[in-house]
């Protein structure tokens, strides 16, 4: 009888240990750029940050490559960050420069994919590198809703996760399109070899960062949870850089937003989303 009792207790102990060590393994879908969409998962977009300048004759190479990438995929999120003797110089560029090139000067053009990955030279021959960072299937999604009116911005950014995430940061940019200015062009095979390009249309130009440009901590997000960040601010004013006067203020009709989530440990963007002003978005969920 004693032996039977001991055997039963041993069996119960093994059962308890087994239960404690059980791990639930989730089968996540293929996240490669060519994989078919799986219902319920989010689209994954690639963030392209183009450090550029109107004075930079080689910078047209990157702007051309971005347009080629956009023509291939609707999951490309471009941002043009102007620097130097430029009417659209972004004065808050220093933290970004120190992040991506801590020991080197910012010799333009410079381009980064998902904030930290170098876009291989020449970018026009490596468009697929950017496309390969997109996917039909990821577990974190972004949606934005905005009202831009009467000189003010009311913007909601929502982030939803299909698995647990930790140590996340959010970056939100305000961009402006349809800015026309002379652009130097040293690439004779691009833009018909015109140099300079008169009234070049500059789009996706970074005008303000609504968060810390290196990211605002949002901590952890649990599976199935949605977090929301709201911005209620006046449309930012811009100051004319040295050597330029009377640079127009931001045109509300040409405003757009880019929001992206980065991992705090390596500063890599894990998803991004672009939105026009006064657009109400749903999450990019596969049907």
Language model regions located:
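The N-terminal extracellular segments of secreted preproproteins, especially immediately downstream
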Residues: 18, 55-58, 160
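Membrane engagement elements in two modes
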Residues: 29-35, 44, 60-61, 68, ...
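Exposed, low-structure sequence patches enriched in small/polar residues
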Residues: 8-10
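Local sequence-structure signature of Cys/Sec-based thiol-disulfide redox active-site neighborhoods
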Residues: 37-76
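Short, conserved sequence motifs used for protein processing/export or organelle targeting and
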Residues: 79-287
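Short N-terminal helix-initiation segments at or just after the protein's N-terminus
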Residues: 22, 50-57, 194-202
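Bacterial Sec-dependent N-terminal signal peptides
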Residues: 2-5, 15-47, 285-287
